[in-house]
Amino acid sequence: MNRLFTILCMVSLLVLHTSCNDSVMDLESPNVEMKTRAVEQRVQNLIQQARQGDVEAYYSLALCYRDGDGVEKSWLNMICMYATYSQKTGGDIEDVVELFDEGHPFRLLFEIMDSPSFNEEVEAKLERLKQSAPAEAKAIDAAKRAFTMDEATVAMNIFREAEDEGSELAVIFQAIYYDEAKDKTGQEECLTRIAEKYPFFNLLLGESYVMKYGECEDFSYIQKAIDCYYKADAYGMLIPKYANALWGMYDYFGQKGMLEYDEQEVERLKVLAKRTY
């Protein structure tokens, strides 16, 4: 389970109250719309700051994803932003749990996934999770019974059901399944699909294209990889490892005349590639 949580790390919506009174709603709606636009604009500003390497912007975006503030609530996207913040500041990714109060479903999920085995204490936490986040508990229940690839294949149906019911952990389990099964076609389809909601999965998809380039040296795969990295970058999710990879592509293929070398962009990527260790 520790290995699974390591992979996972590498890796309430904004409620607007409106009155039933038509006249009050007419007065409040413009303010609500203005507030919504302001919040969305703030998120876009934070993303642009993150794309320039502003460390605090990563932390602020993590909170936005935690709270659903201007974006759809997502603990997976939250972890991506917090992980980058941690890499930039020398912090510990596991401190992300401190963003939640005791008893919060994410804390339960964290504690379950961080446990080396399913002992009685963990089973009790899983029962509590079933009450507060049943879709996540459903995914864990299926995963803990999948010891072989055949069992994992059966569990995939449950993972898809759990994902439809709102489980984000089920998304991770599906990505891991295709990786362990060495199913490159299934992996590409899976990553392409889930990257629409969780942009950082574009980084893994891009990495898979780089590996394909290594097998056949078809430059179109490098172009696909670059496209994927920039899709993640558009959300401020180009983490140091992949910023460094993209910088390397500009350097290597630029010298060969296969990519246009953009010095200003390379300098930006160098900033993003920096970490404290």
Report each predicted region and the residues it spans:
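C-terminal motif of bacterial Sec signal peptides marking the signal peptidase cleavage site
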Residues: 16-19
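Bacterial signal peptide processing site
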Residues: 21-23
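Short coil/turn and helix-start
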Residues: 51, 69-73, 116-117, 148-150, ...
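Short helix-capping/linker turns of helical repeat alpha-solenoids
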Residues: 51-54, 67-69, 88-92, 96, ...
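Hydrophobic face of amphipathic alpha-helices that form TPR/SEL1-like repeat modules
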Residues: 60-67, 81, 98-103, 111-112, ...
